[in-house]
Amino acid sequence: MTILFQLALAALVALSFLMVIGVPVAYASPTNWEQSKSLIFVGSIAWTVLVIAVGVLNFFVI
């Protein structure tokens, strides 16, 4: 269970870092917004799922 928690936490940190860089770039360029809209929404959903998963796994690890 600890390994799964660590992998989920690493994925959350990596996705957070990518979204901190990618979302402002997508919002700043008007031509990229139409192309990046679905990717931003999927990333947001994945981030939310990872936050919940890390919280649940934290309950089982500690």
Curated annotation (Swiss-Prot):
Keyword Protease in record: no
This protein's GO CC annotations: photosystem II reaction center; plasma membrane-derived thylakoid membrane
Family, as annotated: Belongs to the PsbZ family.
Assembly behavior: PSII is composed of 1 copy each of membrane proteins PsbA, PsbB, PsbC, PsbD, PsbE, PsbF, PsbH, PsbI, PsbJ, PsbK, PsbL, PsbM, PsbT, PsbX, PsbY, PsbZ, Psb30/Ycf12, peripheral proteins PsbO, CyanoQ (PsbQ), PsbU, PsbV and a large number of cofactors. It forms dimeric complexes.
General function of this protein: May control the interaction of photosystem II (PSII) cores with the light-harvesting antenna, regulates electron flow through the 2 photosystem reaction centers. PSII is a light-driven water plastoquinone oxidoreductase, using light energy to abstract electrons from H(2)O, generating a proton gradient subsequently used for ATP formation.
PANTHER family: PHOTOSYSTEM II REACTION CENTER PROTEIN Z (PTHR34971:SF2)
Protein name (record): Photosystem II reaction center protein Z
